[in-house]
């Protein structure tokens, strides 16, 4: 998947036609200019390791969580997430900032699901989002 990010950005930068997923990837990259130079490093970006001890945020994970939230909002799953996103966007005036606020509850829900071996608890996840 990492290579898809790099390829989408390369094609976007060259003004080439993008497939739908590539367009989504390029859009989220464009909203994170702090990652662009690093992504353009090519192989170094593909091979980079991100560990809690390293203290570096994983750009691929961060952008992937943006994409996950966008998909959840588009499908309103869990039911009510589109309203939460709309309210957060209204308060901040910025949909991207709303997504940043929503990332931590999503990451927590995914971590808990992985740890328990169960699907994410959508009700608990939505409750966390509603408290933002």
Placement of each model-derived feature along the sequence:
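Sequence termini and other peripheral, non-core segments
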Residues: 86, 91, 95-99, 131
């Amino acid at each position: 998947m990492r290579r898809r990010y790099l390829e989408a950005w390369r094609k976007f930068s060259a003004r080439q036609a993008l497939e739908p997923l590539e367009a989504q990837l390029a859009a989220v990259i464009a909203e994170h200019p702090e990652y662009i130079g690093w992504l353009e490093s090519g192989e170094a970006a593909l091979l980079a390791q991100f560990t809690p001890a390293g203290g570096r945020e994983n750009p691929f994970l961060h952008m992937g969580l943006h994409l996950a939230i966008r998909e959840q909002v588009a499908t309103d799953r869990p039911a009510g997430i589109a309203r939460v996103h709309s309210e957060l966007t209204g308060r901040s005036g910025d949909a991207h900032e709303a997504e940043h606020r929503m990332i931590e509850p999503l990451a927590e829900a995914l971590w808990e699901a992985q740890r328990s071996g169960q699907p994410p608890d959508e009700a608990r996840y939505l409750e966390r989002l509603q408290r933002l």
